[in-house]
Amino acid sequence: MTEGVLWPELNGDVPRWQDLRVSLSSGRPSTNPPTFGTFRNGLEMWSFSASQVQNLYFEAQMPHGWVLGSEIRPHIHWSPGNSTNTGAVMWELEYSWANVNDPFPASTIINSTQAAAGVAYQQQLMPWTPISGTGKRESSVFVCNLSRVGNNAADTFTGVAFGISVDFHYQVLTGGSIEEFPA
């Protein structure tokens, strides 16, 4: 095998994008959780109400191969289920991000709206504002709260919105860190 053909990112010259994926089926319900119910046929996912704020909690740890200090681009994959409504859904991400051996700072809230495509069961991807990675290191951890803000005037989608996953796009130049536990 020619070096750099199978793993061209190991050349370290051109940043590549990777996904840090969080499956919402593993999210922890809050005191006002969405309903885990039928999405399509025998498939189930979390369905978020159109009339209230419902949320799930999760965590995510930055990989060792991440380009330190580069921005992180969070987004959600979601679906309108069987609805053909074209109203907008407001998704909110509250997070606190800390390095190993650092205290978690006060949380930050970012939100965004996206119109449903009007196509039943379509998978949609909605980005949030990028998050600065300045000062963050490998193994830093996000503690997160995902909400659909169904009671907000900007949320005009009248059906339930199904949450599939939250992803954080990040850049890599290598396959990982040299140290197992980077300082």
Residue ranges with predicted function:
Residues 128-131, 135-153:
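Cysteine-clustered segments with highest specificity for TGF-beta superfamily mature ligands
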Residues 69-80:
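A short beta-strand element within beta-rich, extracytoplasmic domains
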Residues 62, 78-82, 150-153:
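Short amphipathic, basic-aromatic surface patches that mediate peripheral association
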Residues 149-183:
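Proprotein-processing/basic-patch segments
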Residues 1-52:
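N-terminal leader/pro-regions and domain N-caps
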Residues 101-135:
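Extracellular carbohydrate recognition and processing domains
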Residues 50-65:
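Short beta-strands within extracellular/lumenal beta-sheet-rich domains
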Residues 87-101, 166:
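Extended low-complexity, serine/threonine- and proline-enriched intrinsically disordered segments
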